[in-house]
Amino acid sequence: MTTASAPAPPWPRPRGLLLDAMGTLIGLRTSVGATYAAVAAEHGIDAAPAAIDRAFPGVLRQAPPLAFPGLDGDRLLEAERRWWGERIDAVLGTAAPTALHHALFDRFADPSLWRVYPDVPAVLRRWHGAGLRLAVVSNFDRRLQPLLEGLGLADLFDTVVVSSSAGAAKPSPRPFRIALESLALEASQVWHVGDSAEDGAGARAAGVRCLLVRRP
């Protein structure tokens, strides 16, 4: 895990670390396009993996936040599924059947589709063993907790904050503040590690120092 730049002057040693998930701790084993196309084919829809991979980043950038204030339980799950269904339709360029929406939602909940970056387990164990409080802060939904469990990482974290249930997504400071409250730490006692401009902006807005990593 390499950082974009070393802090100067040195920052005080943190008591806790907040970490982004996708692109920082974990990544997909195969492209989004390959998975979308394979599942779409099971539902009788032809889709080109390369075209999906080209469209997907732009669709996500233009999407409203994956955040649903005031919702929980089944209502939150329904909102998460609907949000992703709209993205699926936009990527495929057609109104896909609800069954395909649900199949893709469930497919990306499968830990076997994901990989932990090689440096992550040892680094997390070292931090955890040193007594640092650890939390995940991610622009994702409630599938993340079972994903981390399936990937063998969940026990290393004191809390997992996802935008869908936090009611706000990075670059909002709200997910960071929820994590800080859960860890019982002040912003000055914590660093955030992420990989995107949203990580940096959200952390700064919450008063948290941020390091950005660059993955190949």
Range-by-range predicted roles:
Residues P111, A130-G131:
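Structured helix-beta-strand junction loops
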Residues M1-L17, G27, A41, A50, ...:
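Asp-based, Mg2+/Mn2+-dependent phosphohydrolase catalytic module
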Residues P7-P118:
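N-terminal helical cap/lid subdomain that shapes the substrate entry/recognition surface
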